[in-house]
C-alpha cells in the first residue's frame, strides 16, 4: 500500500 503521511512511500 502507499501512504503520503508523514512522507510519500509505498510498501
From Swiss-Prot:
Major localisation = secreted
Residue ranges annotated as transmembrane are none
Where is the PTM Tyrosine amide found along the chain? Answer: 11
What does this chain do?
Antibacterial activity against B.subtilis, E.coli, S.aureus, M.luteus, P.putida and S.cerevisiae.
Q: Which organism is it from?
A: Hoplobatrachus tigerinus (Indian bull frog)
Name of protein? Tigerinin-1
**GO cellular component terms, semicolon-separated:** extracellular region
Detail the disulphide connectivity of this chain as listed in its UniProt entry.
2-10
| Keywords from the UniProt entry | Amidation, Amphibian defense peptide, Antibiotic, Antimicrobial, Disulfide bond, Fungicide, Secreted
Gene Ontology biological-process entries: defense response to bacterium; defense response to fungus; killing of cells of another organism
List where in the cell it is found.
Secreted
Expression by tissue, per the entry, reads: Expressed by the skin glands.
Q: Which domain of life is it from?
A: Eukaryota
